[in-house]
Amino acid sequence: MSLSIDVTSLPSFSSSIYKNESSATASTLSGKSIGRSVQYVSPDAEAFSKYMLSKSPEDIGPSDSASNDPLTSFSIRSNAVKTNADAGVSMDSSVQSRPSINVGCDQVDFSFNKGIKVNANLDSSISVSTNSRKEKSKGDRKSRKHYPKIEAESDSDEYVLDDSDSDDGKCRNCKYKRKYFALRMRMKQVAMQLIEDL
């Protein structure tokens, strides 16, 4: 069995992040926060989205997530599996469980542009060989009769040979004459029995 999974593209996401500006010293060039005490995101959400799309998921760290405080930080790799192709999944679903701090709201929607291609091939071969025995029917058992053995010396002396059986008188005094006639009589009986059974 061979299983191959082809992920043709990384998950793309569009983020709409709105936060209150808490410091006047903010970096507007890089689009990410300067330090833990500074909670600022550039108001240009489209530029931030392009910046996030240009990086691979392995290279994205806490500084790229637009929030360095533990209350609003999130991991893209751990939440990227919770996506729906038709509708994005809001990753800020636990806002109500957070303490009420004036940090604003952040929402990131994930969606796959291209699906995951899965190829699974299962190759198997089954060979079955059976030996069937043919059960003997009752008719076969009835037709098989045990005939008595014919002795070499028979009591009957009346054996007549035809002209076709005689070979210029050489067989008249043959010592196997009685065995021959006994065998011929037995073969006639077997032939008659076969004709009756049919």
From Swiss-Prot:
Mg(2+) binds at residue 92. Residues 153-166 have a biased composition (Acidic residues). The keyword Ribonucleoprotein does not apply. Signal peptide: none annotated. Coiled coil: none annotated. Keywords: Glycoprotein, Host cytoplasm, Magnesium, Metal-binding, Nucleotide-binding, Phosphoprotein, RNA-binding. Residues 127-167 are annotated as: Disordered. InterPro entries: Rotavirus_A/C_NSP5. Its main location: host cell. One of its GO terms (biological process) is viral genome replication. GO terms for cellular component: host cell cytoplasm. One of its GO terms (molecular function) is nucleotide binding. The modification Phosphoserine is found at residues 67, 154, 156, 164, 166. It is found in: Host cytoplasm. Its cofactor is Mg(2+). O-glycosylated. Belongs to the rotavirus NSP5 family. Plays an essential role in the viral genome replication. Participates, together with NSP2, in the formation of viral factories (viroplasms), which are large inclusions in the host cytoplasm where replication intermediates are assembled and viral RNA replication takes place. Orchestrates the recruitment of viroplasmic proteins such as capsid proteins to these factories. Participates in the selective exclusion of host proteins from stress granules (SG) and P bodies (PB). Also participates in the sequestration of these remodeled organelles in viral factories. Homodimer. Interacts with VP1. Interacts with VP2. Interacts with NSP2; this interaction leads to up-regulation of NSP5 hyperphosphorylation and formation of virus factories. Interacts with NSP6. Participates in the selective exclusion of host proteins from stress granules (SG) and P bodies (PB). Also participates in the sequestration of these remodeled organelles in viral factories. This is Non-structural protein 5. The lineage of its organism: Viruses, Riboviria, Orthornavirae, Duplornaviricota, Resentoviricetes.
